[in-house]
Regions:
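Membrane-proximal extracellular/periplasmic loop immediately following the first transmembrane helix
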Residues: 10-12
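Juxtamembrane interface at the cytosolic side of transmembrane helices
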Residues: 51-97, 152-167
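Terminal transmembrane helical module of multi-pass membrane proteins
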Residues: 114-167
Length: 167
């Protein structure tokens, strides 16, 4: 069933399995899924590294700036929140108003020419139509929005505490 195929694809692409445990895709589709697996792996590493860098900057800024720690911490949180908010809103706008161009640009950036376009009768396209990618992109950007708002609110709380302590 489609659900079992999807589960196998998700396990493979996410790195949970060493090989794709279904035999419904062409060699080109399997090759593309292998490329997707590599992109997901690099993306996961970049996400973790960005988190480590963020916390290193946050904590080093906190310890380096002495009496101005709260100001620096608040600014870092607000800047991180605003940058993520703007990024997410730009990508969501791109998804809504320019999906084909954004999809093509993304694939052109991460995949070799001719390795990511398939016919409309392809099992890969039938299993993952355009609406899947619109929904997935929107869900990812909603997560960015939540994170951005968290940083902005936390920065605002620190601003309120800072003002209260200065009174």
């Amino acid at each position: 069933s489609a659900s079992l195929v999807n589960d196998a694809v998700v396990a493979y692409v996410s790195g949970s399995g060493d090989e794709l445990l279904v035999d419904v895709f062409t060699a080109d589709e399997v090759s593309h899924l292998s490329d997707v697996r590599a992109v997901v792996s690099v993306g996961r590493i970049m996400f973790m590294l960005s988190g480590v860098v963020f916390f290193l900057v946050l904590f080093s800024g906190y310890w380096v700036f002495g009496v101005h720690r709260l100001v620096v911490l608040r600014r870092l949180l607000l800047y991180a929140g605003v940058i993520n908010l703007v990024f997410a809103l730009l990508v969501i706008s791109g998804i809504v108003f320019w999906f084909d161009g954004l999809f093509t640009a993304f694939h052109g950036l991460f995949f070799a020419d001719g390795t990511w376009q398939f016919s409309s009768s392809s099992n890969l396209i039938l299993l993952y139509p355009q609406t899947f990618f619109v929904d997935m992109g929107t869900a990812i950007m909603k997560t960015f929005l939540l994170g951005a708002n968290f940083f902005i609110v936390l920065g605002g709380v620190l601003l309120a505490l800072e003002k209260k302590w200065l009174e």
